[in-house]
Design a protein with these regions (language model features):
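Glycine-rich active-site loops that engage anionic ligands at enzyme catalytic sites
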Residues: 1-179
Length: 179
């Protein structure tokens, strides 16, 4: 299930599940993450899951790379393990102050903002991870036609509560920040 396990500095391990971003790979990452948490392995300090990677930080005084690697490889993880999920409704305001890219999207897609909103709100998203800023969800599987490239020059300030469309993700800004 893990394609490669390598060093990440002297006290961390990098588990690579593949380069694609999809639910199947992300589910594998989460299964390993939850299983390692459940095992409560002495010497593991921190687990950091992402779309398709898992970073495991460890205490060199208790465990080394080879020991942790062997423990990870010997975990009995199956796709049968049910993943607990939650549905969360996120209120979104489409006011001009929060829809910073709507005009750019209208031009790119050659459709009205109402049609953009209809496509966006007509979908249920999957949260691949949170990060960049505290609690910011990376909501994936955005329709191809709604995908937008990153801005060449990021904004200095994006208001809290704004929704950004970047590549295949929709992100909700949990704090005012650059973006």
């Amino acid at each position: 299930m893990i394609k490669n396990i390598s060093n990440l500095g002297d006290a961390a391990l990098y588990c690579d599940f593949g380069s694609e971003v999809n639910k199947e790979i992300n589910s594998k990452v989460i299964r390993y993450f939850k299983s390692i948490q459940k095992e409560n392995i002495d010497g593991i300090n921190n687990l950091t899951p992402s779309y398709n990677k898992l970073i495991i930080s460890f205490d060199l005084r208790k465990k080394n790379f080879q020991t942790i690697k062997k423990l990870i490889e010997n975990l009995n993880i199956t796709n049968d393990d049910e993943l607990e999920t939650n549905r969360i409704k996120i209120p979104v305001c489409c006011d001009e102050n929060f829809s910073l890219d709507i005009k750019r999207l209208e031009e790119k897609l050659q459709i009205t903002r109402d049609k953009i909103y209809e496509k966006f709100f007509g979908k249920e998203f999957f949260c691949y991870m949170t990060g960049f800023i505290a609690g910011m969800p990376f909501l994936g599987d955005l329709e191809n036609e709604l995908q937008a490239k990153r801005l060449e020059t990021p904004r200095v300030k994006v208001p809290k509560g704004s929704v950004g469309l970047t590549e295949q993700f929709a992100n909700v800004y949990t704090f005012e920040s650059p973006g």
